[in-house]
């Protein structure tokens, strides 16, 4: 068995004295593991860092085997990804999200989204918005997609300011007003208003996706996967607060 594909490194773990098992995300073969011989060598260590884009060739006798990767570098981002807290926590949190999906299950749109996000992790506003949209895409692929395109009560497409915690559907201002205390806030940038994300809207968006991830994924699976995400959320919102306070009045 053999195939080749582009990939983004999600993580590695030691195997024996000189090798590693690499975890990558590919467009055609999903999240995939493979042994990299001499992966701890001076030549390979800089290549096998989370966030780097590589070309992999996977070989195994049988499809169900772990198999081996031959890895060639394409774009090495890791050096700059360790420069900011948003990027350090971000790449860890993205890997945690992708591990919610079955191994070797192709999700090409998530690979493309991942490639975009890792190039924007150092910009807190862009990284935060892209990360929230990535979480929504993962929820959708897991079968728990939110419908934010129209009001779940009236069908209206304007003044969408709430999300029902029960149905995961957007609710317009008029229909949701009597139940506002029970509703989740729908940030402007997710309601089709083409507004840029800011500290307040991102904080609301993080609460929104956290609610549905906890309800549908983490709690049913008994998974505690919040640490990297919490670190990313904290770093992103802190960076936006700092930028806002330093901006000219």
UniProtKB/Swiss-Prot annotation:
The UniProt entry, under Pfam families, shows: RecO_C, RecO_N
Q: Establish whether keyword DNA repair is in the entry.
A: yes
Output the superkingdom of the source species: Bacteria
Q: Does the keyword DNA damage apply?
A: yes
InterPro entries per record: ARFGAP/RecO, DNA_rep/recomb_RecO_N, NA-bd_OB-fold, RecO, RecO_C
For biological process, the GO terms are: DNA recombination; double-strand break repair
What are the protein's UniProt keywords?
DNA damage, DNA recombination, DNA repair
Record's Gene Ontology CC terms? bacterial nucleoid
Known function: Involved in DNA repair and RecF pathway recombination.
Family membership: Belongs to the RecO family.
Q: What is this protein called?
A: DNA repair protein RecO
Gene encoding the protein: recO
């Amino acid at each position: 068995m053999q195939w080749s594909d582009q990939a983004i490194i999600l993580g590695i773990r030691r195997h024996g004295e000189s090798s590693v098992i690499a975890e990558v995300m590919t467009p055609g073969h999903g999240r995939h593991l493979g042994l990299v011989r001499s992966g701890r060598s001076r030549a390979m260590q800089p290549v096998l860092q989370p966030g780097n884009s590589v070309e992999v060739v996977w070989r195994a006798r049988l499809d169900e085997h772990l198999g081996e990767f031959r890895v060639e570098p394409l774009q090495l981002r890791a050096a700059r990804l360790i420069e900011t807290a948003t990027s350090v926590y971000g790449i860890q949190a993205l890997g945690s999200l992708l591990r919610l999906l079955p191994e070797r299950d192709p999700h090409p749109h998530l690979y493309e989204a991942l490639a975009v996000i890792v190039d924007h992790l150092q910009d807190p506003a862009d990284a935060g918005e892209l990360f929230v949209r990535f979480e929504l895409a993962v929820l959708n692929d897991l079968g728990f997609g939110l419908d934010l395109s129209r009001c779940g009560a009236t069908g209206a497409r304007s003044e969408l300011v709430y999300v029902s915690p029960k149905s995961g559907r957007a609710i317009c201002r008029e229909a949701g007003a009597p139940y506002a205390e029970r509703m989740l806030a729908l940030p402007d940038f997710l309601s089709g208003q083409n507004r840029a994300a800011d500290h307040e809207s991102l904080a609301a968006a993080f609460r929104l996706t956290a609610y549905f991830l906890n309800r549908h994924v983490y709690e049913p699976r008994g998974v505690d996967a919040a640490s990297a995400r919490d670190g990313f959320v904290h770093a992103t919102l802190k960076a936006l607060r700092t930028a806002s306070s330093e901006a000219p009045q």
